[in-house]
Swiss-Prot record:
InterPro entries, sorted: Mdm34 (IPR027536), SMP_LBD (IPR031468)
One GO molecular-function entry: lipid binding
Biased composition (Low complexity): 306-317
Organism this protein belongs to: Cryptococcus neoformans var. neoformans serotype D (strain JEC21 / ATCC MYA-565)
Keywords: Lipid transport, Lipid-binding, Membrane, Mitochondrion, Mitochondrion outer membrane, Transmembrane, Transmembrane beta strand, Transport
Name of the featured protein: Mitochondrial distribution and morphology protein 34
């Protein structure tokens, strides 16, 4: 089973970007940084890109109303990018403070023993991920994510010092090491803290909230009642089309997945039961055309003594069924008496 993420480019609001940038900044500044980086690492820009990741469900370990546990395969090779800003120490003498000046050849340009801090901008793009992960979703505890292998396959690192080949290779190696540690140690905690903002309440009655997605209010449709529907149709028979209430069309993503309505379960139940009827009238559903047919059960022995006709002999698609000749039955008179009276 695979999953498709519809509308990936518009699924994240500015509030999500601000929270994600703050958590990424805290994760990058946590722990020991390379000695060449001085000061605080600032996350300047975060863009989720246009191409969504792919998830393939491999195994379901636990499935209930408020809990899911499974093993999935994650794949991503999109156009997301991250830009950070920091200060690096450009003075080579500061890396080895025990080095004496007598061991260095003196030349015209002298090197300073004080550290020289140079601002640098890093841009991470062309991220390629492939991993097997264990996903646990709980309505009360949030989302727990564990990678079973190293997800990072490749990343493109560009910086202010791309013209210097030695510095470029050094930064590529250091950033890849920091990203591998972040995916292993810090990213599961970031996703868990973000998921706790999405879920509110506890247990089965908990309500799931998505504060980061900008969604317009969607009208809810109540279950269809035939009597109320007929009365409304009779009252609105003479109204003009301009007075009817119109709703905007539903947004359909690139994967063909529509956002569910608030009363979608009732609509699916009504649609399922609409075929189990002998009524010639079809229930009205948005974007769905339904035709009611009589129930075709097992064929019986024809017309029984009780006068019930078998519907199994009728077939759909053979053309219109011609109406039979109307028969008149009179109680208390025989057929011969009727012919004599008519003569």
């Amino acid at each position: 089973m695979s999953f498709v993420f519809p509308s990936w480019s518009t699924a994240f609001s500015p509030a999500f970007h601000e929270d994600a940038k703050a958590m990424l900044e805290g994760a990058l500044n946590k722990g020991d940084k390379p000695p060449v980086i001085q000061g605080k690492i600032e996350v300047v820009e975060l863009h989720m890109g246009e191409q969504p990741p792919t998830l393939t469900l491999l195994e379901i370990g636990d499935l209930s109303i408020d809990r899911f546990r499974g093993i999935l395969r994650l794949g991503y090779q999109g156009d997301a990018w991250l830009e950070v800003r920091c200060r690096v120490q450009a003075n080579p003498l500061s890396h080895n403070p025990h080095l004496t000046f007598s061991t260095l050849p003196l030349s015209t340009p002298l090197l300073a023993s004080q550290p020289l801090l140079v601002p640098m901008t890093l841009r991470l793009s062309k991220l390629h991920l492939r991993a097997i992960l264990i996903l646990v979703v709980s309505a009360s505890k949030g989302i727990t994510l564990v990678f079973k292998n190293d997800p990072l396959q490749n990343v493109d690192v560009s910086s202010t010092f791309d013209s210097v080949e030695v510095i470029r290779g050094y930064l590529q190696q250091e950033i890849e090491g920091q990203l591998r540690e972040m995916f292993r140690e810090h990213l599961p905690g970031i996703i868990h803290r973000l998921s706790q903002k999405w879920f509110s309440g506890s247990g089965v009655g908990g309500k799931v909230e998505m504060p980061y997605r900008d969604m317009s209010p969607v009208p809810s449709y109540a279950p269809i009642n035939e009597e109320v529907e007929e009365e409304e149709n009779e009252e609105n028979h003479g109204t003009s089309p301009g007075n009817e209430e119109s709703f905007p069309p539903r947004h359909i993503g690139p994967g063909g997945i529509t956002l569910p309505l608030n009363n979608s379960v009732s609509q699916l139940a009504a649609l399922s039961y609409s075929a189990h009827t002998l009524s010639p009238y079809a229930r009205g559903h948005e974007h769905i055309a339904v035709r009611s047919f009589p129930y075709l059960g097992k064929s019986g022995a024809g017309t029984g003594s009780s006068g019930r006709a078998s519907l199994a002999s009728s077939s759909v698609g053979e053309g219109d069924i011609k109406a039979k000749r109307k028969r008149i039955f009179r109680i208390g008179k025989s057929k011969e008496a009727d012919e004599k009276s008519e003569a």
